[in-house]
Each structure stands twice: as C-alpha cells, then as structure tokens.
Amino acid sequence: MTTALTEQNAQQAATAGRVVRVIGAVVDVEFPRGELPALYNALTAEVTLESVAKTVVLEVAQHLGDNLIRTIAMAPTDGMVRGATVTDTGKPISVPVGDVVKGHVFNALGDCLDVPGLGRDGEQWGIHREPPSFDQLEGKTEILETGIKVIDLLTPYVKGGKIGLFGGAGVGKTVLIQEMITRIAREFSGTSVFAGVGERTREGTDLFLEMEEMGVLQDTALVFGQMDEPPGVRMRVALSGLTMAEYFRDVQNQDVLLFIDNIFRFTQAGSEVSTLLGRMPSAVGYQPTLADEMGVLQERITSTKGRSITSLQAVYVPADDYTDPAPATTFAHLDATTELDRSIASKGIYPAVNPLTSTSRILEPSIVGERHYEVSQRVIGILQKNKELQDIIAILGMDELSEEDKITVARARRLERFLGQNFFVAEKFTGLPGSYVPLADTIDAFERICNGDFDHYPEQAFNGLGGLDDVEAAYKKLTGK
C-alpha cells in the first residue's frame, strides 16, 4: 500500500453507504457516485442483535459496478439488515505495531484480547503492504544456528528463510515451536510473532499459558484467527502477524522469528472466500488465485540488509497427498522442510525429526562448508544403510549380517539416539535441563561417532542428551567408571 494511495483513501474517510444485500459472510454495499472505497479498505457497520450493539468490520473485495461493492465480513453478520449504514474508514485493516504488542494476544483486526483497547492510540500499520524492493534484499546466505543438533547438522535453517514443519498430532510439533521461541528469546534476545491461522482455540490458550510459565511471553506477540471465525478473518490473520513482524525488522532492526500455524488453513480460507465471491474454482476446488495469494504472503517474509524475518510454518498435508495444490504451492517457497515422524517419536526420540526426509537448500559445501557437508552426508548414509538392512534383520536376525553391516547398524542406533535432545520447554516433563549445542561441537560429535570412537559405549549413553560431555557423564554413570 503506497503512501500516496493511503493519503487518498484517508481523504475519503467517513463516506457512508448502505447495505443492499447480505448472504452470510458476503455483504454488498451501495455508495454515492464517485465515492467508492478502494479495494481492501476496511468498512464498519453498527449491528444490534438481541439489544446488544456491536461493530462489524467489512473488507472491500470487489467493485461490481453501478456504485456497488462486494465485501467480506470479518465477524458474523447476524443482525445485519438491508439499509444499514456502512462507513468507509479510508484505510485498510490496521494493527498496532512496536513494543506495545509484545506479551499480548491480538485478533486479525488488531484488537487486543487480553487488554481491550491496548495499542489503538499508538502507531498502526495497514496489513496490505508491498514486499521489500530488490535493492533492500540481503544478498548473502547465513545459517540460523538453533543449538538443536538434528536441525543444525542435517536440515540447517536459513536466516530470513522459510521453513516448513510437517507433523501429525502428538509428534511434538507444538513443543518444537515453543522451543524455537524460547531459544530465539534466550540466545539472540530476539522477538517472535506467532500467527494462529484457523486452528483450535484450546491450542492457542495452552500456548499462551505455557509461554507465560516459561518466561518468554514478554518477547512474543500472538495473533489469532481461530477455526470458529469467518473465512475473511482466517485469510487475513497471517498478514496481521506478518505486519507486526515487519515493524520489528524494518524500524527496530531486529531479527524476527515468525510462526504460522497452520499455513494450509490460510489456503483453505482463501478457497472459501473465493467461492463466496463467485470465482470459478481451479484444480481440486481451490481458488484460481492460489499461487498469487501465497506469493503475496511469502514474498514479504525475507531478509533485508542487516535484519531478517525467519518463518517457521506448520504445513498440513491433506490425506498425506503431497501433490495436492495447497502444499505443492507452499513447497515452492520453502528453504527447508522439517518432517516429524511418528515412528521416531514412538522410540522416545525427541525432536522426532526424520533426517532422511527432511531437507534444506543450503546443505551444500559452498554455504555450510566442506566438513559440515561431509559429516552430514556420512550420518545420512549410515542411517539410510540401516534402514535398508531392517528387512533383513526382521526376517533373518542380526546374526546373518556381515561384520561391516553389524557395525553400521550399531552406529546408526547410536546416531539415532544422539539426534534426540533435551529441550528447555520439556524440563518439567523429562526432569532433564535443556541444552544448547554449538554447531562446531555438533559437527565434531557426529564425526567422532561415525569414526567409531564411541562404538564401545552402550546405546543408553546417547539418549536425549546435549553434547559429548553429557554422553561421557552418562557413560560413567552407566558403567560406574
């Protein structure tokens, strides 16, 4: 949204129209000739239902001709009637920005849910904004070191990149998200923004309470548009959260972590809105503008010179079909994918990241370095060989393997366990303190395991630990040496 356009819209503020048709979340409004509000402008209408008055926000979606516009309601339209007065605010939906949003919960319209009215008298930004221009973009690629071994070694994250997080219920997706928020706050003194898109209200409440308990809420802004809200809200809440993150990046020069849970619900809401607006559906019933809508969101998530927004996006895959247009369109924008696997979680290994199916575009020697790349490939090779041998082991048993294969399987089992790690947010469940393992220590540790330096250590010595110091301590405890 350009400055000139915003000023022009502001001049049209307080222009009044009237409702001519209401069909669920779609409201058609008539305005005086020459005074039509711009696309994406926010309109307000006063609605009374059962003697209770409320303000319903509408967003302009189409100009129909004959002074009519079609809008999408951002709240239930119960009680709205034909002839009701609608006022043009002269600007798009705007949300509070700056330090005032930290430690609080907002909805997609920028209203604070835990402290009503908070931030409305301060600076506000419209949620429809242009992505950074080409000359503002950061040219170099930099690793975001998380201190989580399996991620840093095998699926390194890009600072200012977009990471897809795949996982079903109960495999540790929410725990990994909370852990990343905690690490950004503790290790980098950074700010996190969490956008809950179309997920359960209970999950949002749990997240808020657990973050408050961990002491990281004061560094995090939360924006929710849950699954019981109209599709317009679910479609815009990701943009609201992103706008708050952009302020921290562009004005306060901070590195920001943006969580979107779930990016599929953003696509799903767009499909609902598209159908409501009468557009012809595309493949599998999705909106014809799917790629464009995804691009508008994703292109704003990037690194500019000296600061970045790194996004961790939970991705639901319908019926585990990765060719479905929704996840397929998302994949095109991702720099790394982290898949949480139920079979790994069932072994008690957390985070349950599958190292053989998770990927990162920066895992190459020119970016991470020759040694990092070589060690990662050795680890993946041993784990892959172990997977191939499982059928033979299941049928014939370990005794039928060659000595070389027996060594490979033994090292793979140690590697699998060592890829697990104790988390800060899980201390109350495990009784073990969380650990941050520097990347250099991670590379050294896995290289030594691959070399066979710890073949005489029992597998139990590698369970859910941090670095090699923890392994040594566990070995002494197990053996009494």
Curated annotation (Swiss-Prot):
Q: Name one GO molecular function term.
A: ATP hydrolysis activity
Which reaction does this chain catalyze? ATP + H2O + 4 H(+)(in) = ADP + phosphate + 5 H(+)(out)
Gene Ontology cellular-component terms listed: plasma membrane; proton-transporting ATP synthase complex
UniProt keywords, alphabetically: ATP synthesis, ATP-binding, Cell membrane, CF(1), Hydrogen ion transport, Ion transport, Membrane, Nucleotide-binding, Translocase, Transport
**Where does it primarily localize?**
membrane
Q: Which SUPFAM superfamilies match?
A: C-terminal domain of alpha and beta subunits of F1 ATP synthase (SSF47917), N-terminal domain of alpha and beta subunits of F1 ATP synthase (SSF50615), P-loop containing nucleoside triphosphate hydrolases (SSF52540)
Annotated membrane topology is: Peripheral membrane protein
Residues that bind ATP, according to the entry? G167, G168, A169, G170, V171, G172, K173, T174
Presence of keyword Cell membrane: yes
EC number, as in UniProt? 7.1.2.2
Q: Where in the cell is it found?
A: Cell membrane
Q: What subunit structure does UniProt give?
A: F-type ATPases have 2 components, CF(1) - the catalytic core - and CF(0) - the membrane proton channel. CF(1) has five subunits: alpha(3), beta(3), gamma(1), delta(1), epsilon(1). CF(0) has three main subunits: a(1), b(2) and c(9-12). The alpha and beta chains form an alternating ring which encloses part of the gamma chain. CF(1) is attached to CF(0) by a central stalk formed by the gamma and epsilon chains, while a peripheral stalk is formed by the delta and b chains.
Relate the protein's function as given in its record. Produces ATP from ADP in the presence of a proton gradient across the membrane. The catalytic sites are hosted primarily by the beta subunits.
Q: Which family does it belong to?
A: Belongs to the ATPase alpha/beta chains family.
What this protein is called in its record is ATP synthase subunit beta
